Amino acid sequence: RRQRQMCIRDSPNRRDGDYHAEPAHGWIGSPLEPLGNPLRAGVGPGAWAQRADVPDMTMHGEAKIVPLRVAPDHGVSKRDNDPRGLPVYGADGAVAGQVADLWVDRMEMMFRYIEVALPDGGRRLLPIPFARIKKDGVEVHALLARQFADVPSTRSPEQVTMLEEEKICACYGAGQLYATPDRKEPIL
């Protein structure tokens, strides 16, 4: 029995790269399975929209989402736990990195991302909805510790573009289903 393969490449709406999928079965309407690294394949729960590759701006012309280190007029409430300096744990319980900073949405007055410093020196953004902040660390169910290196990084250390936000959030979304092989199976 020959598996019919479908690769989606170089769509005019995806100027910046390929994304791949193939049918899981040989019949029409079969669910698609990602090819390659499922966290970066751009399909299923890891799909992302081709948004503008520029930062979202405030009505004053400043980058809307920035780290606290460049937004001195924002901070963590004294009544809340400040996670900066705490370890970040992946779904496997291993340390993925350490909280380096928090990224604030200046227009909505809320934190959008946790900046994670990885052991190799890289930095990745962790969307707040994927994080469970506790007194002794930050837990992330979506990814294993080693998979944080697969999260797309930002070009600038002080702002994030709308396209980068899409790809970052898509990576964590993909992790919900593809981080481990057993997550793809039905839950009974």
Where are these regions (language model features)?
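Peripheral interaction segments used for macromolecular assembly
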Residues: 1-5, 9-188
